[in-house]
């Protein structure tokens, strides 16, 4: 009877209290689930101290130990940063941080002569203050991750001055995009009538397509240097491969990622007949500034006292990453172009837009429910921006978790298909060696807990991909 009495008492609570309690309960349930998974994976890092027999041919014990220690440090950092984030979010909700920030935004607007009727203006001030708070509270964690963990394991290439300049630039660019887009979205919702959700969805669709189109040409160059890949054998072979699968390649760029990190990557962008490929310099063995630094440090005299410590130079050289040979770079690109040829990019866009439309439709259904606003401290007003925040971030959180897991499963399937496409191009052997090198260069740990990898990994574990490629190589 006691349990049923408690349940009856729960249902007799005001709707806003039930909603608030359910949001907090679900948030902590997800956090505890994530922590449980992380601890399972951490146990793997701690107990797997020797190279498993099946990895003996592809990874030496020194690299294995370095990757194990790197992932252990990342795991520890993730635990404490996750605990802080969950605690911070809970305290903000419990102590009315969202309505307080809304009232503070109203006061700032009042000082400038804007009354309560200027809701969109107040919403923009709210967004500015919220993103500023998020940036400031996240800064110590980002600093520690970059200058302690990444530095310790040889990945960080930034100075403190570069890091701070980069952070400020990112914040300013974000505001230049976020504030105008948000103001237009709020205006569309205000004037859209009964079918505002259709207009809001179409607007966000156009914005996302525009951002994808201009990102690499106008936004990314604000942070990194892009240079055309020099004429030569690699560029010729990339163009030949692109032509063989009818990929409408117009340009190939190399981005100077080495000034920020020694992690490597490659991607393509653009719509219709204007596709471009971007290679990180850290991916290219013959191009990487990091490899040139190795030669300089090992073949030149120390430039100053700080660099004069031979042990420091040895450690620096040891931590540099080798990148991939041209054949391996082509195999990696064959995999990436496989995503395009197999329609993965289009499928992901369609899924994203179907999800966006569904969310705006459900938002239209729920926005009139005053108890949703009351649950988060808004008893006398129902600002549109706050409605978006409450519904998209809190009310939709169970749906978002399920969708995220489904997309992770789909992503792994796409990765296997892209590997198979690279094999059809005759790149199985080179992709096999490239995956091993990239895993080594990025200190990826090749052993994973099955439940952790199932929930988190958007790419299949290394061993699974290698086994699939080995099977392909035999045919």
From Swiss-Prot:
Tissues showing expression: Widely expressed. High levels in kidney, prostate, testis and ovary.
Name of the protein in its database record: CAAX prenyl protease 1 homolog
InterPro entries reported for this sequence: CAXX_Prtase_1, Peptidase_M48, Peptidase_M48_N
GO cellular component, as recorded: early endosome membrane; endoplasmic reticulum membrane; extracellular exosome; late endosome membrane; membrane; nuclear inner membrane; protein-containing complex
Cofactor binding summary note: Binds 1 zinc ion per subunit.
Disease connection: Mandibuloacral dysplasia with type B lipodystrophy: A form of mandibuloacral dysplasia, a rare progeroid disorder with clinical and genetic heterogeneity, characterized by growth retardation, craniofacial dysmorphic features due to distal bone resorption, musculoskeletal and skin abnormalities associated with lipodystrophy. MADB is a disease characterized by mandibular and clavicular hypoplasia, acroosteolysis, delayed closure of the cranial suture, joint contractures, and generalized lipodystrophy with loss of subcutaneous fat from the extremities, face, neck and trunk.
Single Gene Ontology MF annotation: metalloexopeptidase activity
Annotated source species: Homo sapiens
Cofactor: Zn(2+)
Induction: By type I interferon.
Chain positions recorded as Zn(2+) binding sites: 335, 339, 415
Active site: 336
Family recorded in the similarity comment: Belongs to the peptidase M48A family.
Stretches that traverse the bilayer: 19-39, 82-102, 124-144, 171-191, 196-216, 348-368, 383-405
Keyword Zinc appears in the UniProt entry: yes
Subcellular location: Endoplasmic reticulum membrane; Nucleus inner membrane; Early endosome membrane; Late endosome membrane
UniProt topological domain (Lumenal) ranges: 1-18, 103-123, 192-195, 369-382
Gene3D superfamilies: Metalloproteases ('zincins'), catalytic domain
Recorded topology in the membrane: Multi-pass membrane protein
UniProt keyword DNA repair, yes or no: no
Reported function: Transmembrane metalloprotease whose catalytic activity is critical for processing lamin A/LMNA on the inner nuclear membrane and clearing clogged translocons on the endoplasmic reticulum. Proteolytically removes the C-terminal three residues of farnesylated proteins. Also plays an antiviral role independently of its protease activity by restricting enveloped RNA and DNA viruses, including influenza A, Zika, Ebola, Sindbis, vesicular stomatitis, cowpox, and vaccinia.
EC number, as in UniProt: 3.4.24.84
Broadest EC class assigned to this enzyme: hydrolase
Chain ranges on the Nuclear side, renumbered to this chain: 40-81, 145-170, 217-347, 406-475
